[in-house]
Amino acid sequence: MDGLDWDLLDRLAADGTMPNWKRLETEGATARLRSFAPLISPILWTTAATGAPPDVHRVLDFQEVDPKTGAKVPISGLSRAVQAIWNTASAAGRKVGVVGWWATHPAEEVNGFFVSDHASPILFEGLPLGGAAYPPALEPGLAQVSAREGAIPDAELARFVDVPPGEIAAARSTGAGLENPIVALSRILASTRATHRIARDLYDRERPNLLAVYYEGTDEVGHVFASSTPPRLACASQADVDRYGKVVSRYYAEIDRLIGQWMRRAEEDGATLLIHSDHGFKWGADRPCALASGNWATAAFWHRPDGVFVSWGKRARRGSPRGDASLFDVAPTILSLLDIPPDRVMPGTAAEFAFADLRALPVAERANRPPVTRVQAEPMSTKEASEYAKKLMALGYLSRSETRTSAPAPAAGDRPAMTEGAWNNLGVYYRDTVKDPARARDAFEKALAIAPDYYSPMFNLAVLARADGDMKMAELWLLRSMAAIRTDPGPVIGAWSREFDAKGNAGAALSLLEHSARAYPDSEAVARELSMHHYRMGDCRAALAALSRFEPTTKEPRTLNALALFATCLRERTTVIRLLERSLTINPNQPEIARTLARAQNR
């Protein structure tokens, strides 16, 4: 279940929203699941399924380059360079079932059944379904289930949102995409219910030894509605909180009902139920105010490294304290439960603490394993690939620069080539997880070789240069990345300059701010950051000079408050009063500013 986080689950279990989850915690074994950077779902779920690091399994982005046309298409199992647990279990004679796992299209031929991620109505609705199932005879049934479960009535949506029925109907009739909360909720519910129905029906029919099911909505509901969920964020309107503030708890109550059904199946069959996420999610005051946009790929800003791991059933160790596990431990744990040795590509170990009778098996060499065979997939047109990319952008998974649907040239050979996003993600993995700046730099440069105007590797090269102490190069790459993204650089420039100041490098901070002010003369935010730097350095007149040109036209209380601060420093009481009165006229909800104004008036 994507994006599960203990903070939210503990709260919903305690308040009675998720009684089945509370039972899981009480009767099973739980752990914090350590993930790794970058916190991007296709990468992490492929590590969970293979036990291999990203630079080994090679699923590194939401997209790949078609080896025949050079077009960007949705990431597929063709990018995966190693076998998954279902291949290993199938080859060992176990019956397996897979439903909806990230990057698994076309469906793989296994000893059992296989439904690829293209059966999900969230990202793949309206795209070719051919090749989504093994045996292929399952495909007509998949289409029927998706159509039936995907038909979410307006009255059903009304159970989740506090929106008048007429507005729900109007939102759905406009043809809006996932950027519309009502439409997004309908697709999240459709995907959740279709995935669950397909998995449950096939499990009941086939009773495999291993069933691997991926639920996407537990993450998507956060990306769409977490900003409207209490406690209220400064960037969230009260109207949105009133309309959508209960969506998350109501959706997780639905998830709890589905979990209860799997618990009953596990009890009936004496099976072990494992539930894990790929990463956690920010649900408290640490939630970012950045929303999905065409400039920033913001989805990963909401993720945090600590996810969720739960085991439940006869073999689970009951009521043990919450432990610690790694995402790399998932695959060897599952293989050990099936009495199959882990593979040498797996750096993790079986989570023995979570089970009463589990023992880690010796690593196996599998040199002559049969290759993965996949069914024939229906080709995807450039238009269809573009629609997929637009959905990813609406959810904050891709920036606008990454939605271009063609690469400079077709890939060599039969395997898909890596996109600029894949190289950038690999660089982040090398820099932040492996701690190998040389390989990280090489990956970022490969990303720029494909897309010279791609802002993210520029920014990441700036981070590398800053870590190396090369402030001039850090400034160069940072300003290049800000120019490429074509948005107000003030918040980022300010954060970097304050960090330079905090580390005692005021010269680097001033250089960055002055160059930024020249590059962005119309940016009030940059001017405000430069003025605050001058103020911190004790030069109130330079601070005033850097920002005063924006005073006549500004509608930003922060600018007026900063100017009042400088005027206070210069003992210009009348100016202070005028500026603070104007600031409070724009935003009366500033109690500290109101107190400052009162003190100035009473002197």
Language-model-derived ranges and their functions:
Residues 422, 457, 491-492, 526, ...:
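TPR alpha-solenoid repeat register
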Residues 22-23, 85-92, 260, 271, ...:
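Non-catalytic, well-ordered alpha-helical segments in soluble enzyme domains
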Residues 52-239:
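His/Asp/Glu-rich, glycine-adjacent segments
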Residues 276-314, 364-365:
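Histidine-centered active-site microenvironments of extracellular/periplasmic hydrolases
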Residues 7-47, 51-54, 95-99:
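Short, structured active-site-proximal loop/turn typified by the sulfatase FGly-forming signature C/S-X-P-X-R
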Residues 419, 454, 488-489, 523, ...:
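Residue-level recognition of tetratricopeptide repeat
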